[in-house]
UniProtKB/Swiss-Prot annotation:
It is an enzyme of class 3 (hydrolase). This is Acylphosphatase-2. Residues 9-99 form the Acylphosphatase-like domain. Pfam families: Acylphosphatase. It comes from Sus scrofa (Pig).
Length: 99
């Protein structure tokens, strides 16, 4: 039996021009390409928030995308990450947009 790579979970909130620019759709697409699970949703204060889970290197790739790239029409001012922790199993089976 091979040693499983540690799984990570992290919450995020993205600030800037991230609503009305297909940010959630692009986030969902990118998460599926990278191979992480979790969710994304708009907040009432104009930010986008969510959670990402998966192998550490894939979570790190998604964190980079959420910090620097986003959707083509977005402008990311900053991204806050919180509650980063190692988990024993994934809490989600896919990545979804929440409303």
């Amino acid at each position: 039996m091979s040693t499983a790579r540690p799984l990570k979970s992290v919450d995020y909130e993205v600030f800037g021009r991230v609503q009305g620019v297909c940010f959630r759709m692009y986030t969902e697409d990118e998460a599926r390409k990278i191979g992480v699970v979790g969710w994304v949703k708009n907040t009432s204060k104009g930010t986008v928030t969510g959670q990402v889970q998966g192998p550490e290197e894939k979570v790190n790739s998604m964190k980079s995308w959420l910090s620097k790239i986003g959707s083509p029409s977005s402008r990311i001012d900053r991204t806050n990450f919180s509650n980063e922790k190692t988990i024993s199993k994934l809490e989600y089976s896919n990545f979804s947009i929440r409303y």
